Amino acid sequence: MLGFGPFELILIVVIIALLFGARKLPELGKGMGRGIKEFKQEMHEPSPPRPQVTDIPSQRLDPVTGAPVSTESTVPASDRRS
């Protein structure tokens, strides 16, 4: 499919050297190596278990403060009219 010959590979290396500069190439390679190493480690290590979702009744939140809004009336029972 993508058969790169020696000329294409040399051309790619020259373009990369022009873009990043000769001084940055070792740092670029080191960073890529670390990234690949971390990726491989993550692939081999099992992921930690996910926390269980519990059924917590949802509360209404005040749109301004974000604080839970009480569903109970704030008027004392003696002041209520029936």
From Swiss-Prot:
Q: Which InterPro entries match?
A: TatA/B/E, TatA/E
Could you tell me the keywords of this UniProt record? Cell membrane, Membrane, Protein transport, Translocation, Transmembrane, Transmembrane helix, Transport
Where does the chain cross the membrane?
1-21
A GO biological process this protein is involved in?
protein transport by the Tat complex
Instruction: Kindly state the subunit structure of this protein.
Output: Forms a complex with TatC.
Q: What does this protein do?
A: Part of the twin-arginine translocation (Tat) system that transports large folded proteins containing a characteristic twin-arginine motif in their signal peptide across membranes. TatA could form the protein-conducting channel of the Tat system.
What is the official name of this protein in its record? Sec-independent protein translocase protein TatA
Q: How does it sit in the membrane?
A: Single-pass membrane protein
Protein family: Belongs to the TatA/E family.
Give residue spans, biased composition: Basic and acidic residues. 36-47
One Gene Ontology cellular component annotation held by this UniProt entry = TAT protein transport complex
Where does it live in the cell? Cell membrane
Native species of this protein?
Deinococcus deserti (strain DSM 17065 / CIP 109153 / LMG 22923 / VCD115)
Disulfide bonding pattern of the chain: none
GO molecular function ontology, one term from the record: protein transmembrane transporter activity
Predominant cellular place of this UniProt entry's protein? membrane
Task: Give the residues annotated as coiled coil.
Answer: none
The record ties this protein, via Pfam families, to: TatA_B_E (PF02416)
Q: Which HAMAP family match?
A: TatA_E
Report residue spans for region: Disordered: 36-82
